Structure formats: structure tokens, C-alpha cells
From Swiss-Prot:
Gene behind the chain: ybcI
Name of the protein in question: Uncharacterized protein YbcI
Superkingdom of the organism of origin: Bacteria
Biological source species: Bacillus subtilis (strain 168)
InterPro entries, per the entry: MpsC
């Protein structure tokens, strides 16, 4: 039985939450994944600790938190790419991420080698 787009998105969200817990030591409050053409867009909410919000009160602190958090995520990119490959069967061509120090949200964009959304439409 083929998986639906929604079930794949849900599986990616759960797997990335588990990766966060295993690799970073804590997970997000909520994760939402969307497949759009050749991209997988993951929105993670509630990733900053209360102490990090305080540090983000100054420009230097905010830049420090953003840089450190980005380095942590990017140091584990191979694990994230493996999650996407295992669930979708698609290789990741590039990875982009950013963190909002104001809202505590992170957005991850996995750019794939193929149009996953179109391929799923053919299967379903």
C-alpha cells in the first residue's frame, strides 16, 4: 500500500522531532511538515529555551544564539538527509534553515533532486 502525502508529512515531522531529542537533547513544541513540488518545508515551533529568549534580548546575544543553533543543526545534516531519504526515497540536493529569535520558530527547507509532490500524485 502506498503512503499518502499527509502520512509522509506526518512521518517526517515525527522523525525530525525524534532526531531533535536524540541529537540536540530536546524537541520542539510542535512540528508541521509540508511537501511542495521539489521541497519539504518543516516548521518547528518552540525550539528556544527560556534562557535563550533572555539572551536574545540583545543583538549580540541574538546573533550568538542563531549562530550556535544553526551550527548545531547543520552539524547533524547527514542524519536529517537520511531521514528524508528513508521516508521519501528522494535524495536531498540542498538544505536551508533559519531561526526566528523573536518567535522561537525554525524553518527547514529540504530541496530535493526530484519533484516529490508530482511523483506522489502519479502514485496516488
Amino acid at each position: 500500500m502506498k503512503k499518502s502525502k499527509g502520512s509522509i508529512e506526518s512521518e517526517i515531522s515525527k522523525s525530525i522531532t525524534q532526531w531533535e531529542k536524540d541529537y540536540l537533547g530536546r524537541g520542539s513544541v510542535s512540528v508541521k511538515t509540508d511537501i511542495l513540488r521539489d521541497m519539504i518545508i518543516v516548521n518547528l515551533k518552540g525550539i528556544l529555551t527560556p534562557a535563550e529568549y533572555v539572551v536574545c534580548g540583545s543583538k549580540e546575544g541574538m546573533l550568538s544564539i542563531k549562530q550556535t543553533r544553526s551550527e548545531l543543526v547543520e552539524s547533524g545534516i547527514e542524519g536529517l538527509k537520511d531521514i528524508i531519504l528513508k521516508i521519501t526515497g528522494e535524495k536531498v540536493k540542498s538544505f536551508h534553515t533559519d531561526l526566528s529569535s523573536r518567535t522561537g520558530e525554525r524553518v527547514m527547507v529540504f530541496k530535493l533532486c526530484n519533484d516529490l509532490e508530482k511523483n506522489l500524485e502519479k502514485i496516488l
